[in-house]
């Protein structure tokens, strides 16, 4: 399997981005006037294809590959977040830890906004289904608050 990670990010102030803030009451109240960074990372469609091939021959290998994929995409996101954190701290600001849509009280629908705002489908091949699943499956969207 030859797959390199892909990432996209965008720094914005949600108060200036009325269409983004208007999509979610939670976003309007939590991030009003706050600068944020949208993040998206993936290990690519090749991983999904490799995992499908494994599932035909061995359920155990398919299960192990699931964990490998999760660990790999988390590493991609950790590295992207660290890169942004260094830049933000160089400006004398602080980056709060990333939060992904669907965890806690962050609405799952925010993934759709992040994908759109980052143009992630065109830029890195990440899209979202009608039921809000990311494709390729080992992809992550997130938001970090800058303070």
Spell out what each predicted region is.
Residues 91-147:
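Short terminal or interdomain "cap/linker" segment that borders an active site or interface and mediates
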Residues 55-109:
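Long, amphipathic alpha-helical coupling/dimerization segments that relay conformational signals between
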Residues 15, 51, 65, 85, ...:
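Generic detector of well-ordered alpha-helical segments enriched in charged/polar residues
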Residues 7, 34-37, 56, 73-76, ...:
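Extended aliphatic helical segments
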Residues 1-62:
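Active-site helix-to-loop segments that bind/position phosphate- or nucleotide-bearing substrates
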């Amino acid at each position: 399997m030859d797959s390199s990670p892909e990432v996209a990010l965008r720094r914005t102030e949600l108060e200036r981005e009325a269409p983004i803030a208007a999509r979610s009451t939670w976003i309007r109240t939590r991030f009003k006037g706050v600068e944020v960074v949208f993040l998206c990372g993936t290990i690519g469609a090749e991983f999904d294809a490799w995992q499908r091939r494994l599932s035909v021959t061995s359920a155990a290998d398919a299960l192990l590959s699931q964990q490998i994929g999760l660990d790999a995409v988390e590493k991609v996101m950790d590295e992207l977040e660290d890169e942004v954190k260094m830049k933000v701290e160089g400006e004398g600001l602080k980056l709060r830890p990333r939060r992904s849509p669907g965890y806690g009280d962050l609405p799952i629908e925010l993934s759709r906004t992040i994908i759109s705002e980052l143009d992630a489908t065109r830029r890195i091949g990440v899209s979202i289904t009608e039921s809000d699943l990311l494709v390729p499956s080992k992809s992550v969207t997130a938001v970090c608050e800058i303070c």
